A protein has these predicted regions:
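A structured beta-alpha segment of the ubiquitous adenosine-cofactor-binding alpha/beta core
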Residues: 1-2
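Active-site substrate-recognition segment that forms the wall
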Residues: 6, 10-26, 31-112
Length: 112
């Protein structure tokens, strides 16, 4: 089957490159595009509730990145996110000890 379209939305998330590899041509003169998706891992951690309010907090870490603390599931706080380039199999993604330490250090500056 052959299809023609003015635009194609590749909504495959971290598998976008694999889906793109299955296409034969594109609108750039009949050849495959050479750009690759850049995968970035944004991890979160859930910890025992850090505050009593129903409000979310936005914190700025020493590296100027923004970290949020959101009430989660009643008894927890959701803390995130990290921003780490990722070059492995998306099916094998998991938070690293360094990311956990980063998020804990950021929150420790504001909550005791």
């Amino acid at each position: 089957m052959q299809l023609r379209a003015r635009a194609l939305v590749n909504a495959a998330g971290p598998w976008a490159d694999q889906v793109l590899a299955t296409t034969k041509t594109c609108a750039t003169g009949g050849t495959k595009r050479q750009e690759r998706a850049i995968l970035v891992k944004g991890s979160h951690i859930a910890v025992p509730r850090l505050h009593d309010s129903d409000f979310a907090y936005i914190l700025q870490h020493t590296d100027r990145r923004v970290i949020f603390v959101i009430p989660y599931e009643g008894k927890c706080s959701l803390i995130g996110t990290t921003d780490v380039n990722f070059h492995c199999d998306p099916a094998q993604v998991e938070i690293s000890p360094e990311e956990t330490q980063y998020l804990c250090a950021a929150v420790s500056e504001y909550f005791t």
